[in-house]
Amino acid sequence: MKIFGKWLLVTLLICSMPVKAALDIVITEGIDAARPIAVIPFVWQGTGPMPSQISDVVMSDLARSGTFSPADELSLPQRGISTLAQFNASAWMTQPAEAVVMGSIKPYGGDKYLVSFELIDLVKAQLQPDSQSAQDLVIDSRETIITAAQFRQYGHRISDVVYEKLTGIRGAFLTRIAYVVVNHGEKSPYKLMISDYDGYNEQMLLRSPEPLMSPSWSPDGQRLAYVSFENRKAEIYVQNIYTQQRTNVTSFDGINGAPVFSPDGKKLAVTLSKDGQPEVYVVDIATKAIKRVTNHYAIDTEPSWFPDGKSLLITSERGGRPQLYRVFLDSGKISRLTFEGEWNLGGSIAPDGRSIIFVNRTNGKFNIARMDLETRFMQVLTSTRLDESPSVAPNGTMVIYGTTYQGKQVLAAVSMDGRFKARLPVGQGEVKSPSWSPFL
C-alpha cells in the first residue's frame, strides 16, 4: 500500500450506516403499464412486535423492478393468510393480479426466525377454479431460518424467486451499486460508497480531499477498481471491499482512467496517456504487464469488455467526433458501431452481449440510449438532461446512470425498454459514477 504525503488524510474504512436508505428511489414513469401482483403482509406468529416486515421489502422490490405493480393492501380480498390451505380462490376471482405472494414469520429460538412463503398462480385459479387440485396453484414455496439482521436480505431473495418464476429472468435484487458522493462543503468531500441496489446498507470504502471516480466491480463482486487523485495525480487502484486491502495498479504521468475488469477478473482495460494521446491498454493486475490496444492520433478511451473477453467497446474520436467502436484484442481490427446523433460515448455492454448502452448526444442533449448490435436499431431511453455513466444490471433489465436534477448530480434508473423510469436522490451532496455489481 502506498505511503501518502503529509498533506493528505485518506480514511479507509467500512462504516455501516443506520438502517435506512441512503438513496431513496422515486418512481417517475412506467408503473401504470406494469404487471399487477398481490403481496399479502406476512403473518407474524410470535409474541411481541415483529422484527421487520419482509413483505414490505418484497413489495418495494417488485415495484422498483418496473415489471410489476403490487396492489394496495386495502384492496386485497384476503389478508392475514399465509398458506394455500387458507387461500379462497373464489374471493380472488375479480382481483386484477397474476399471482399472490404470502407467507409467515415465527420465532425459532434465540435470534432466529422461520420464514415461509408461497407464490400462488392467480390466473390459473381464476380461469380454472374447479379443474385442478389446490396444490396445482403453487408456483413456488420455500421456508428458511434467518436471523433478525437477515430480514432485508431474505426479502430480496424472495423477490428474486418471484421475479424469476414469473418472468423467466433472474432477479437482481440481491445486488449492490458503487458510486461517488461529493459534499463540497466538507474537508474531505469525496467518498467512494457501496450500498444495496435500493440504497440500504450504505458503506464507505474511501474518503479523500481529492476526486474519486469511475468505480468498476470485479466479476466476483469482491473488488472495486477506481481512479483516485489522492496523491495529486490520477492513479488506478483495485480494492477488496471486505478486507480493505488495495493495490496501486497504474500511476503513470498523465491520464490513468476508466478502469474496467475483464470477464475473468485478472486484467483491467484502462485509458492511459503515458505515450502521448489517450489510448486504451490492458493491464494484468497481478504482474502489472501492459498491452497497448489502440494506436491512433485521436483520443481513444472508455473501454468496456464484451462478455467473451476477446474484444472491447471503446469511445474514439478517430472519425472526428466521439463515437463507439469495437476493437478485437488479437487482431487489432476495429469497426465503428454508432452513426446516429452528434456524439455517442461512454458505452456499456448488456450481459448477453447483444446490445450496447451509451450516452447519445442529439441536438445538444445528452441521453441514455440502447442499440441492438444485430439490427443496429437505436432507442433513446431517457428524457432527463446531462445523462452520463450508464451501468447495466446483471440481468440486463435495468440501467443505472448519472444525471442532473434540480441543479444537482443524482442517480437515476431506466428499464432496458425505456418504459420505466426512477430517480435515486440522496439526502445531502451529489452522487455520480454509478456501477452495478454482478450477481452476488
Swiss-Prot record:
One of its GO terms (biological process) is protein import. The keyword Secreted does not apply. Residues 1-21 form the signal peptide. SUPFAM superfamilies: TolB, N-terminal domain, Tricorn protease N-terminal domain. It is found in: Periplasm. The keyword Signal applies. GO terms for cellular component: periplasmic space. Pfam families: PD40, TolB_N. Keywords: Cell cycle, Cell division, Periplasm, Signal. InterPro entries: 6-blade_b-propeller_TolB-like (IPR011042), PD40 (IPR011659), Tol-Pal_TolB (IPR014167), TolB_N (IPR007195). Part of the Tol-Pal system, which plays a role in outer membrane invagination during cell division and is important for maintaining outer membrane integrity. Belongs to the TolB family. The Tol-Pal system is composed of five core proteins: the inner membrane proteins TolA, TolQ and TolR, the periplasmic protein TolB and the outer membrane protein Pal. They form a network linking the inner and outer membranes and the peptidoglycan layer. This is Tol-Pal system protein TolB. It comes from Shewanella halifaxensis (strain HAW-EB4).
